[in-house]
Amino acid sequence: VVLDTREGATYVGRFHEETAGGMLLHDAAGFDPAAGGSRDEFLRRTAKFGVRIDHRSILVPSAEVAGLVPFGDLKL
């Protein structure tokens, strides 16, 4: 899945579950806009080469989630 946060970060990973604490992803790669580059380029690179795992597990608080879509539904 692709999870976008309200702060502009994007995560690509395996959706595990929604808990009281937020959305739990496993084997996720993260994009931070402050680090430079573009979200679209990050997603194109991930589609081409696969997920570069930055986080074995990451819990994103529900209040920070701006969107969640299946990776295959993206138009790259």
Which residue ranges define each predicted feature?
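Conserved RNA-binding domains used in RNP assembly and mRNA/RNA metabolism
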Residues: 1-76
